[in-house]
């Protein structure tokens, strides 16, 4: 089994690295966090020009047809620079659902996502529903009237369209609607890492059959695949954070002197650096295994990957 990256994948990594180094330093990130929009429209436009917004979409829909490996490369590099642009919300979560669905109007929306003109958010989480997304409390009645509340909607304040999971009778259903539709209200807040989240309420929002993306088993499959892919991307982001933290700490210990010698000579710090390196490499290995399992859509594999990388990243950054 060849686990080496292809020439194209290596070039992609180098392209993203150069962009982040020149266009997205920590001060740039801080300016974005403090801004009202929670992302930089100019940076988002550059993402589109680089082709990154088109990466995971099928070629039939106007995308580049890249897969989980390329997305993982992208998010690893994003993790190194703590990029907070709403790529996960629009391209991964919402984009995956649209791209893999049989929704008739999906290509037009995907085209606008790829060009950077449109943000789409996936509203699936609800208060007191744990991690079971198969039976939402948000309802769509027989007259296609939507009622309910979603929480932790990534980039909800900036999205022009929303994909919402709901129950229509006993069937799980996914609907697509404009965020400014009458009856939709948004309360936005910032997450601990500076990203934008929203609680979105739907009160007697009138839809029709054209708003329905998928129902029943297809809706569940689309949600599962979308969340699994997003879990993989977040895990890759954590791996990138860990690697950057390790390299910066290593550089610091070599340059900082105490008692007439670099502190990297002190055994206790050497042990700490070794521990950081081992954690980082183990996380990378688990990420690679998850990338190889992505087509099997193994929920447990992605959950274990995220759990380990999150814990390891937390340990490494303390």
Where does each model-flagged region fall?
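Amphipathic, small/basic residue-rich leader segments at the start of a protein or domain
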Residues: 1-88, 108, 112
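Glycine-rich beta->alpha junctions and the first turn(s) of the following alpha-helix
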Residues: 3-12, 52, 79-80, 185-281
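N-terminal glycine-rich flavin-associated loop
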Residues: 83-104
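A short, Trp-centered hydrophobic/proline-enriched beta-strand micro-motif
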Residues: 116-125
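Cytochrome P450 C-terminal beta-domain/meander region
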Residues: 132-147
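Single conserved hydrophobic/aromatic residue that forms the stacking wall/gate
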Residues: 308-318
């Amino acid at each position: 089994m060849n686990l080496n990256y292809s020439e194209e994948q290596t070039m992609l990594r180098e392209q993203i690295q150069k962009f982040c180094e020149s266009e997205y330093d920590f001060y740039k990130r801080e300016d974005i966090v403090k801004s009202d929009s929670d992302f930089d429209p100019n940076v988002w436009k550059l993402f589109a020009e680089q082709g990154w917004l088109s990466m995971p979409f099928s070629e039939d829909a106007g995308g580049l047809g890249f897969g989980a490996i390329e997305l993982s490369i992208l998010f690893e590099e994003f993790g190194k620079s703590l990029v907070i642009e709403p790529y996960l919300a629009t391209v991964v979560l919402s984009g995956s659902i649209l791209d893999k669905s049989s929704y008739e109007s999906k290509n037009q929306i995907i085209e606008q996502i790829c060009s950077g003109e449109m943000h789409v958010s996936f509203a699936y989480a609800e208060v007191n529903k744990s991690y079971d997304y198969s039976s939402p409390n948000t309802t769509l009645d027989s007259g296609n009237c939507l009622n309910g509340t979603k929480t932790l909607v990534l980039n909800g304040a900036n999205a022009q369209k929303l994909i919402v999971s709901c129950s229509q009778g006993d069937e799980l259903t996914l609907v697509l609607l404009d965020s400014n539709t009458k009856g939709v209200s948004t309360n936005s807040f910032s997450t601990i890492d500076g990203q934008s989240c929203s609680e979105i309420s739907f009160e007697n929002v009138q839809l029709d059959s054209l708003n329905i993306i998928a129902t029943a088993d297809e809706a569940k499959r689309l949600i599962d695949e979308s969340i699994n892919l997003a879990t993989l991307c977040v895990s890759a982001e954590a791996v990138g954070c860990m690697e950057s933290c390790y390299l910066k700490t290593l550089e610091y210990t070599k340059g900082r002197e105490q008692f007439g010698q670099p502190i990297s000579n002190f055994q206790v710090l050497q042990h700490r650096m070794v521990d950081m390196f081992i954690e980082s490499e183990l996380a990378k290995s688990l990420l690679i295994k998850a990338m190889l399992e992505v087509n099997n859509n193994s929920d447990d594999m992605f959950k274990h990957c995220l759990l380990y990388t999150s814990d390891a990243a937390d340990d490494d950054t303390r």
